[in-house]
């Protein structure tokens, strides 16, 4: 690393227009990762860069890419059509767009009299197909491609696209690109590219990729690790707060009311919980329970790409105090200026994602604060667990302030206004249980230790839903705060009279109720008839059994009589045969006597 972090001490002279871009963007000096990486990557070295979040990694690879495009004359008319010079891959559309914006920020200062340098974004959208991307590529002839693995792979496999001129590949958030979600696409992409190329891998959690980095075709790579006692930059303050899960939402509103911030990002565990709590917080804003006038935004992975882009742009460009409710879709690599507060309602299932979330604030030496809510009990072991990973968290003693109304009564009344809200609350609750069961740190985040009732109250449920985890939970021991039928309120809510605001849905519900009522009436009638006819049916059954026995006895008697008759006939026949035999014997004896007399007379004659 250079002794000085001045740009003049980089080891080579940056192109004048790149230097102008740095000045305009406010990069007065290099960060340690930039000072270490730029000379290596710009000078024919493969690099594996592991540096804390918010340390300027994007500029550390964008500058070498632009330098090489010029140095290798890819910015001339000699550069072949249907070829490209550099490929930058990122795991999400949002991060890809952000990298594109950094590249374009530098290109704004590119001399207009030179052959233009262009970049093209390759991300899946409903607005453009892969064929559209290829058409734009052939028409505009960009030297730099930026995109997500799936779309990049589809693009490179098109016959019209040539890959032989590609001399540099950069993988941002490389550990993510090498995990199970993307590894197949990433490997296929790299097989389509020339082996003689420069490769750069960048991430704040590069260590988690392990030996998978060697699947990227690195040749004698230089490993750059910006050492730090703490994974968080010094400008980022990491805090945690141990709280009863039922009070999390109220504490969140209290923080939004009492903390001074320009922009705040609140991380929720699931997409459905984002949209659910977003609706309620908007309701609180209308009722002036949110003291500070803040603009609330919602962003999650189930939204259409165009909606996500629009929301992220609106939040980034907002001049008023703003809060973004989101999931991990906005956790990696995204650089939003002026974010000075991050709140996590629950820790992420992947512990590596923890620092990526926190790292949305405290970037580029700006002051930032990240607060994580932990449930009381076993989850408190998360603190020493993160210490092993060089992440130090300081406990914050927070109290609910500035909420004069009965918060949970307001929450319940809001839910009772529309049955659809209750349905979404149940879905959010079930999704959270599944989310929690997939946690990587299973020794800390265990379903057996989860406060199911407290979580249910957080999501505004009136009763616990039917699911295997709840059945198991209730079977272990008698739980407090649960009334018969798994109700959490007494008296229970009359679900038959609980209506949807949407007239169409309510009409469907009423029809369903009628059908259920008819079915129940039929079952009831059948049951009553069964009871009424029980004595009669018993008598009939007894008569039938008697007749059956009589028939059996009659058949048996008949069979015995026939057998006796047969035996009698056999005896008579035997007597007749004996008589005949005696007659035959008598006749034979008579014949013998006659014969002997005849013989005797003849001898006398001699």
From Swiss-Prot:
Keywords: ATP-binding, Coiled coil, Helicase, Hydrolase, Nucleotide-binding, Nucleus, Phosphoprotein, Ribosome biogenesis, RNA-binding, rRNA processing. Its EC number is 3.6.4.13. It is found in: Nucleus, Nucleolus. A motif (Q motif) lies at residues 7-35. ATP binds at residues 51-58. Residues 38-224 form the Helicase ATP-binding domain. One of its GO terms (biological process) is assembly of large subunit precursor of preribosome. It is an enzyme of class 3 (hydrolase). CDD domains: DEADc_DDX55 (cd17960), SF2_C_DEAD (cd18787). Residues 248-404 form the Helicase C-terminal domain. InterPro entries: CTT_SPB4, DEAD/DEAH_box_helicase_dom, Helicase_ATP-bd, Helicase_C-like, P-loop_NTPase, RNA-helicase_DEAD-box_CS, RNA_helicase_DEAD_Q_motif, SPB4-like_CTE. It holds the Pfam family CTT_SPB4. It catalyses: ATP + H2O = ADP + phosphate + H(+). Signal peptide: none annotated. Belongs to the DEAD box helicase family. DDX55/SPB4 subfamily. Present with 5740 molecules/cell in log phase SD medium. ATP-binding RNA helicase involved in the biogenesis of 60S ribosomal subunits. Binds 90S pre-ribosomal particles and dissociates from pre-60S ribosomal particles after processing of 27SB pre-rRNA. Required for the normal formation of 18S rRNA through the processing of pre-rRNAs at sites A0, A1 and A2, and the normal formation of 25S and 5.8S rRNAs through the processing of pre-rRNAs at sites C1 and C2. Also required for recruitment of NOG2 to pre-ribosomes. Component of pre-60S ribosomal complexes. The Q motif is unique to and characteristic of the DEAD box family of RNA helicases and controls ATP binding and hydrolysis. This is ATP-dependent rRNA helicase SPB4. The gene is SPB4.
């Amino acid at each position: 690393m250079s002794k000085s972090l001045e740009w003049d001490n980089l080891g080579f002279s940056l192109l004048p227009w790149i230097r102008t871009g740095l000045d305009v963007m406010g990069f007065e000096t290099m960060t340690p990762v930039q000072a270490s990486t730029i000379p290596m990557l710009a000078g024919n070295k493969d690099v594996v860069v592991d540096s804390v979040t918010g340390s300027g990694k994007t500029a550390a690879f964008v500058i070498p890419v632009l330098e090489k495009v010029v140095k290798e004359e890819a910015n001339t008319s000699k550069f072949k059509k249907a070829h490209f010079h550099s490929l930058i891959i990122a795991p999400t559309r949002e991060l890809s767009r952000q990298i594109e914006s950094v590249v374009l920020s530098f290109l704004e200062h590119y001399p207009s009299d030179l052959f233009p340098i262009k970049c093209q974004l390759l991300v899946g959208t409903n607005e453009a197909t892969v064929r559209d991307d290829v058409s734009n590529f052939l028409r505009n002839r960009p030297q730099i491609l930026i995109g997500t693995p799936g779309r990049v792979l589809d693009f490179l496999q098109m016959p019209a696209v040539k890959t032989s001129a590609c001399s540099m590949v950069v993988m941002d958030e490389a550990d993510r690109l090498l995990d199970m979600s993307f590894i197949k696409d990433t490997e296929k992409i790299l097989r389509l590219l020339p082996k003689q190329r420069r490769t750069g891998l960048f991430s704040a959690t590069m260590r988690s990729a392990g030996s998978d980095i060697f699947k990227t075709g690195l040749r004698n790579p230089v490993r750059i690790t910006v050492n730090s006692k703490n994974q968080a930059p010094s400008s980022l303050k990491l805090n945690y707060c141990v709280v009863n899960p039922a009070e999390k939402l109220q504490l969140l509103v209290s923080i939004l009311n009492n903390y001074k911030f320009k922009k705040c990002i609140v991380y929720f565990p699931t997409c459905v919980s984002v949209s659910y709590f977003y609706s309620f917080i908007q309701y609180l804003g209308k009722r002036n329970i949110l003291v500070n006038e803040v603009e609330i935004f919602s962003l999650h992975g189930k939204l259409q790409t165009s909606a996500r882009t629009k929301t992220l742009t609106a939040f980034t460009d907002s001049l008023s105090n703003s809060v973004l409710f989101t999931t991990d879709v906005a956790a990696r690599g995204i650089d939003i200026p002026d974010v000075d507060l991050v709140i996590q309602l629950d820790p992420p299932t992947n512990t590596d994602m923890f620092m990526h979330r926190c790292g949305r604030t405290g970037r580029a030496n700006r002051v930032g604060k990240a607060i994580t809510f932990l449930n009381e009990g076993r989850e408190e072991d998360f603190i020493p667990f993160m210490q092993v990973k060089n992440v130090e968290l300081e406990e914050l003693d927070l109290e609910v302030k500035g909420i004069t109304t009965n918060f949970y009564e307001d929450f319940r009344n809001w839910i009772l206004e529309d049955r659809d809200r209750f349905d979404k609350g149940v879905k959010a609750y079930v999704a959270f249980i599944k989310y929690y069961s997939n946690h990587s740190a299973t020794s800390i985040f265990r379903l057996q230790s989860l406060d199911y009732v407290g979580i249910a109250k957080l999501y505004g449920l009136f009763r616990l839903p039917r699911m295997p985890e709840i059945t198991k939970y209730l079977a272990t021991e008698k739980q407090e705060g649960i009334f018969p039928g798994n109700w959490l309120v007494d008296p229970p809510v009359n679900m038959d009279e609980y209506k949807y605001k949407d007239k169409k849905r309510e009409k469907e519900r009423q029809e369903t109720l009628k059908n259920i009522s008819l079915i129940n009436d039929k079952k009831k009638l059948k049951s009553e008839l069964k009871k009424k006819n029980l004595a009669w049916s018993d008598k009939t059954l007894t008569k039938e059994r008697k007749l059956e026995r009589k028939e059996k006895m009659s058949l048996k008697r008949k069979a015995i009589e026939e057998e006796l008759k047969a035996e009698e006939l056999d005896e008579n026949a035997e007597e007749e045969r004996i008589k005949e035999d005696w007659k035959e014997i008598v006749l034979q004896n008579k014949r013998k006597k006659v014969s002997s007399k005849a013989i005797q007379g003849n001898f006398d004659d001699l």
